[in-house]
């Protein structure tokens, strides 16, 4: 099976060169990317990175401060919308797409369907968000109104298994901040499990929690027989998008929805669309196996684990031996873990809040991409060192690329402009782009990376604190991977125990010529049981030495 490489894109920001970047600017001022920007040439360029799947973030229609009433879409109250553009995770119609992304909003679904077709024709698969835990406070589907959430709820009950929301009967919403006159009565529970009619500014106040039959005020008891109405609605939504040839769903905050629902709904979807993949955003390692073995997820975020460890090694001087402990915690489910260093929730590697320099992400990226056969993901702009240090508006200067505002991201525009002219990229950006292209392409072309076994060398190399070493092998293809998390060039001596040869079923060994696949250079080393490989690795860099035995 080919290794999955996911390229996440915040769709509204992709190659948007139409605006002037006014903080808190409107659509008219700052512009917005369109489905049509993803031309066959543009998609071919994305695939050239080694991409197999594109996660188009922010496809579903969500709350916004932009007026689309002329297209039959009700306005959202500005007091409960984060940013002028709005959060992609405050969905207001599960059956529709964001009109911002269409050249002609009246034809927005047809334009989306054409994007699906172009993506597939480019040899790529499409992933979109499924946001099951919460919806925008003013959710209303103008496409499927007969299935609207809350339409048949008993609003005089705090909880009923057949209600879609949780209510505070006869109690108005009273946030702890100014919502500019927005009224909601009875108040609904807020999306981040805030069971109070008075959410704070730090809560997900723009959303309401969906009810899957769990009585949160009654010892969290589950009432799943008969099937809760929300389950049925959500199954129908997933089937709607699967029928449009979407290849996978990244499921937002999956742990906030009962695993019993996932077990049922994933089975329902895969019965009709067995090829569709489900990726869970999860942060509780104690629940990982339940969401795989019971829930049926194909892949889970490896955030609390590998991501946190790699960030700590990169930024805080943590020993590289901690990487071993991180993968050992999920060794039995390693193939189900999605590795990454950036996404829309996390701070950019090059930001002042992370490493401060994009090149310092190289060794961590080697580990994330090459440690095993499981999927890896990068976030658009990561490959040229986007810093995420703009103050776009609602988001502020926080090291992240905004998901709330209309904006134009300079590095991405210089990378993915309509002419595909990369002459405006700096030498450092060009070099980093080449690194990512080479690394991610190797994940497909080298069988040892796409299908081979993994052997961690750190237990036999206690002296390595700022370097991490492992072997990948498939038959006679052997790769020695080295990551240097140091400001200094490392002259490393890596001991290769006989156990590695036995486990990887290698024979022979001795002096050989090894080729560094990342830069296409050769060096002579000794690779033999119970001997040491001596080589040098540049500061904040890495090597993949291909060894012929």
Regions found by a protein language model. Give the residues of each.
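Alpha-amylase-like alpha-glycosidases and glucanotransferases acting on alpha-linked glucans and related
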Residues: 1-2, 6, 10, 90-91, ...
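N-terminal structural segment of carbohydrate-active enzymes
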Residues: 1-125, 133-135, 140-144, 151-156, ...
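Loop/helix patches that line or flank the sugar-binding groove of alpha-linked glycan CAZymes
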Residues: 2, 17, 64, 79-82, ...
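C-terminal beta-strand-rich structural cap/linker in extracellular carbohydrate-active enzymes
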Residues: 5, 525-549
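Short, flexible loop/turn elements at secondary-structure junctions
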Residues: 11-13, 60, 98-101, 132-134, ...
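Short, polar loop/linker segments at the starts of domains and inter-domain junctions
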Residues: 17-36, 353-357, 523-534
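Short beta-strand segments at enzyme active-site cores
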Residues: 53-58, 126-130, 250-251, 378-381
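Solvent-exposed beta-strand/loop surfaces of large extracellular or lumenal domains
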Residues: 248, 510-532
